[in-house]
Amino acid sequence: MSNDENRSGSPTGPNTSVITKVKPKTKRPNLYRVLILNDDYTPMEFVVHVLEKFFQKDVEAATKIMLHVHHHGIGECGVFTYEIAETKVTQVMDFARKHQHPLQCVMEKK
């Protein structure tokens, strides 16, 4: 091999480098289910109102969830990232306390 070939940067020469692009993988955030628990004291209409106000459910969807809670003891209001789920639970609990209802709202990892 002559000196000219080494200076030209041939693919097998010492000046060869490989550039690779690494695309970082973005991890999806964990999701949490927001659940309402049944009790014997909170009026059904109040539960429907909570679902409309805090979870943007229409009357039909809110009523369906409320009846599920009434018959099964628990019902899912929505699935959110941690911060949003935590905020929703706090809002519902504060609203229920303000209106003197024992309604319970919890979150669990999906």
From Swiss-Prot:
Check the record and name the Gene3D superfamilies matching this protein: 3.30.1390.10
The protein's superkingdom reads Bacteria
Read off the InterPro entries from this record: ClpS (IPR022935), ClpS_core (IPR003769), Ribosomal_bL12_C/ClpS-like (IPR014719)
Tell me the segments the record calls region Disordered.
1-24
Alphabetical GO biological process terms: protein catabolic process; proteolysis
Q: Where is the composition biased (Polar residues)?
A: 8-19
Pfam families the UniProt entry points to:
ClpS
| PANTHER family to which the protein is assigned, alphabetical | ATP-DEPENDENT CLP PROTEASE ADAPTER PROTEIN CLPS, ATP-DEPENDENT CLP PROTEASE ADAPTER PROTEIN CLPS1, CHLOROPLASTIC
Query: What quaternary arrangement does the UniProt entry report?
Result: Binds to the N-terminal domain of the chaperone ClpA.
> Which NCBIfam families does the entry mention?
PRK00033.1-2, PRK00033.1-5
Q: What does this protein do?
A: Involved in the modulation of the specificity of the ClpAP-mediated ATP-dependent protein degradation.
User: Would you identify the family this protein belongs to, as annotated?
Assistant: Belongs to the ClpS family.
- Tell me the protein's name: ATP-dependent Clp protease adapter protein ClpS 2
